[in-house]
């Protein structure tokens, strides 16, 4: 038996390897290696996306973009940049900086046709000023040229495409060109007599109402009586409790800040309440004020009363007006009940019930005739 066991052990060593074999040196080295990822590089596309792109013919078998796909992506990027230029009014590369600059000699042009363009307006000033000088026959004065018009700003309508809003701003390079342009007012352009005013002429504007009330007078003109609660309105949606505490903390201690917020976003609804420990501190906060916030005294809950009837407010017998008022009958009409809707047995449900127990004998004999 011993030689057979020795042969088995030799077969395990030389022939077939044991189950618990040693790992290869390359596997040990692979375990010690660390995978490095470059965060700056773009994320590689997934296998699903690569299959879609390969079926669409945008990439080849090696995963490289085809020339047709690159040309299509370039056109899309150009369209996107054009939309941004149209939306935010970005200047094109070929446009000179002199055309985009404002000058001190500018005019406002109103009552324009909605289909008037910048080119039509430029031709109008060149044509009208040249005809004006021919009529006067003065050699010293020169008409307006396209080079003297440095800027034309014509706001476009958002609702209707390719239509202006009916007015424009034009800047000139010289003061003489400005004077000639002002003389073109009330002249026809596209069937309308346009109006031209200098950018420094503010006549015709309604005068702003002068606020002659001081802070004290404005506080006294408040409809509500002073209280320890201050209502703050016209707040920005990004306003927080810390902003109110920082502003009103200058006058003294703040008991509580109640900022009304939306349930879904948690942002401010535009108003809130600030509670102070006393009325004097609240009045100081009212005098402090704010440039954009609307401040008003709040209503104290402890002093809040429900609206009562005039008889309950004034007293029934002491007020002459309450005596003249007739008392209205306070009764309710009986509810009509359909006898067909009454449940069986409900009619006798409230009837007096007699006891079914044995009656105790009282010593009297009952006779039946």
Swiss-Prot record:
Q: Where is this region: Disordered?
A: 1-77, 200-219, 304-369
Q: Which GO terms describe its cellular component?
A: cytoplasmic stress granule; cytosol; nucleolus; nucleus; ribonucleoprotein complex
Q: Which UniProt keywords apply?
A: Nucleus, Repeat, RNA-binding
Biased composition annotated in UniProt, kind: Polar residues: 209-219
Listed Pfam families: RRM_1 (PF00076)
* Lineage of source species: Eukaryota, Fungi, Dikarya, Ascomycota, Taphrinomycotina
Q: What gene codes for this chain? A: rnp24
Domain RRM: start-end pairs? 105-206, 228-310
Name the UniProt record assigns to this protein: RNA-binding protein rnp24
SUPFAM superfamilies assigned to the protein according to its UniProt record, in alphabetical order: RNA-binding domain, RBD
Name its GO BP terms in alphabetical order: rRNA processing
UniProt GO molecular function: mRNA 3'-UTR binding; poly(A) binding; poly(U) RNA binding
Q: Which residue spans traverse the membrane?
A: none
Q: Where in the cell is it found?
A: Nucleus
Specify residue ranges for compositional bias: Low complexity.
346-357
């Amino acid at each position: 038996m011993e030689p057979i066991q020795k042969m088995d052990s030799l077969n395990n060593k030389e022939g077939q390897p044991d189950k618990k074999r040693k790992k290869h040196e390359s596997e040990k080295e692979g375990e010690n290696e660390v995978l490095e990822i470059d965060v700056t590089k773009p994320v590689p596309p997934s296998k699903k996306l690569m299959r879609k792109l390969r079926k669409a013919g945008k990439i080849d078998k090696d995963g490289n973009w085809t020339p047709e796909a690159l040309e299509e992506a370039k056109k899309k990027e150009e369209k996107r940049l054009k939309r941004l230029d149209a939306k935010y009014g970005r200047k094109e590369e070929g446009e000179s900086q002199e055309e985009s600059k404002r000058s001190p000699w500018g005019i406002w042009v109103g009552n324009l046709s909605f289909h008037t363009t910048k080119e039509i307006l430029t031709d109008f000033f060149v044509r009208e000023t040249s005809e004006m000088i021919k009529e006067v026959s003065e050699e010293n004065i020169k008409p307006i040229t396209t080079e003297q018009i440095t800027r034309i700003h014509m706001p476009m309508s958002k609702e209707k495409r390719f239509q202006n809003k009916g007015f424009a701003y034009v800047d000139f390079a010289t003061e003489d060109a400005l004077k000639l342009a002002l003389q073109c007012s009330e002249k026809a352009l596209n069937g309308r007599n346009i109006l031209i005013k200098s950018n420094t002429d503010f006549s015709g504007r309604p005068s702003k109402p002068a606020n002659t009330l001081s802070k004290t007078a404005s506080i006294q003109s408040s409809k509500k009586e002073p209280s320890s609660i201050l209502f703050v309105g016209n707040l920005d949606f990004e306003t927080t409790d810390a902003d109110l505490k920082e502003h009103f903390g200058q006058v003294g201690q703040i008991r509580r800040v109640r900022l009304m917020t939306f349930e879904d976003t948690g942002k401010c609804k535009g108003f809130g309440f600030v509670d102070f420990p006393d009325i004097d501190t609240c009045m100081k906060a009212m005098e402090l004020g704010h440039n954009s916030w609307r401040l008003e005294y709040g209503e104290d809950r402890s002093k809040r009363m429900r609206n009562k009837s005039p008889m309950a407010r004034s007293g029934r017998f002491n007020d002459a007006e309450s005596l003249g008022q007739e008392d209205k009958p306070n009764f309710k009409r009986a509810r009509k009940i359909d006898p067909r809707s009454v449940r069986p047995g409900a009619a006798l449900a409230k009837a007096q019930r007699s006891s079914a127990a044995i009656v105790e004998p009282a010593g009297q004999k009952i006779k039946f005739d």
